[in-house]
A protein has these predicted regions:
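PLP-dependent class I/II
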Residues: 1-118
């Protein structure tokens, strides 16, 4: 394992730079897309996920209930914060592992759910 780590760190870094750029684009797309539909989330600095509070108008729901709502009504899966311990309650996590077109589609679907609560 140590030899593999050395090879990865000392070898060509082209893939690493491409991966970092890909995740940065996805992060920026989701952060700005959610802001555009009224859900302002903090911009993470170095992760492939976004951790954020549930929108205020859904505060009556647990993180699991909100995640279930998004899954059932929008077909979008997020991780409920409660799965990360008691301090995660009230939050959800978006994984930035899908390609940009699917992330755009997910934001459009989430927008419909947020509008339902108005």
């Amino acid at each position: 394992v140590q030899w593999a780590a050395i090879a990865a760190l000392a070898g060509p870094q082209d893939y690493v730079h491409r991966a970092v750029a890909t995740y940065a684009r996805r992060r920026d797309l989701v952060v700005s897309g959610l802001a555009g539909i009224g859900w302002h989330v903090p911009k993470p600095k170095g992760t492939f996920y976004i951790w954020t509070k549930i929108p205020r108008k859904f505060n009556a729901l647990t993180s699991l209930e909100f995640a279930t709502l998004l899954m059932q009504e929008a077909g979008v899966v997020v991780s409920p914060g409660s799965g990360f311990g008691e301090y995660g309650e009230g939050c959800v996590r978006f994984a930035l592992v899908e390609p940009e077109p699917r992330l755009r589609e997910a934001i459009q679907r989430i927008a419909r759910v947020l509008q339902m609560a108005d």
